[in-house]
Amino acid sequence: MDYYYPMEEEEEVHERPRFRRPVHPWQWHHWQNLLGLLSSSSPSPATAAAAQRCSHVSWEETAAAHLYSASLPGVRKEEIRVEVEDAMYLVIRTELDDGGDGDGGGGGGRRSFARKFRLPAMVDADGISAEYTHGVLRVTVPRLHTRARPVVNLAGGGGGGGGPACDPVARAA
C-alpha cells in the first residue's frame, strides 16, 4: 500500500508568491539610478556605470555632529565643492572630465555628481569641515550647543511659610 505524503509533494512545487509587497514610488533608492543617469552628460553605459560607482553617500549621527561620507573614486580634490544653501541644505557636487582629447571623438565628456541633504535645525553652519582622503569625502556638521537655561533658586522668606518656599514636601504638609 502506497502512502500519500502531501508535505513531500508540496516541497517540490516552487511557485512565485502571488502577492508581493507594494513598491512605494517615492522611496529614494528607486530614483537613485535614474538620477545618476540624468546627471551624466553622455548617455553611454560606461558613463552611467561610472556615475553609479560615484553615488555611495552615507550619513551618521553622533552626539557632537552629523557625519556625511561620500565615496568619490577618481575625483581630484579640486573638482569637489561642498556648499551650504540657505543655511538649510548641505550640497556635495563634483564635475569630472572624462579625459576627452578635444578632437570631437566619442571618448570625452563631462560627468557630474550632486547630492543635497536637508540640515537639521540645530547645527553650526559656520563650523562645517570637510576632508578628502583616499577617494572618500568626509563632511562634519557640528551640532549647535546652546547653553543650559539658568536655574533661579528662590530663597525662603521669614514671612509665614514655616519652611523653605521651594520645598514640595513642606508645601504638601
Curated annotation (Swiss-Prot):
Induction, per UniProt: Not induced by heat shock.
Main location: cytoplasm
The keyword Cytoplasm belongs to this UniProt entry's keyword annotation: yes
Gene3D superfamilies, A to Z: 2.60.40.790
Single Gene Ontology MF annotation: unfolded protein binding
PROSITE patterns according to UniProt: SHSP
Family annotation (Pfam families): HSP20 (PF00011)
Entry keywords, A to Z: Cytoplasm, Stress response
Any one Gene Ontology BP term: protein complex oligomerization
Subcellular location: Cytoplasm
Domain sHSP: 48-157
Family matches, as SUPFAM superfamilies: HSP20-like chaperones (SSF49764)
Keyword Endoplasmic reticulum among record annotations: no
One Gene Ontology term, aspect cellular component: cytoplasm
Record-stated family: Belongs to the small heat shock protein (HSP20) family.
Subunit structure and binding partners: May form oligomeric structures.
Protein name: 18.8 kDa class V heat shock protein
Lineage, top ranks: Eukaryota, Viridiplantae, Streptophyta, Embryophyta, Tracheophyta
Name of encoding gene: HSP18.8
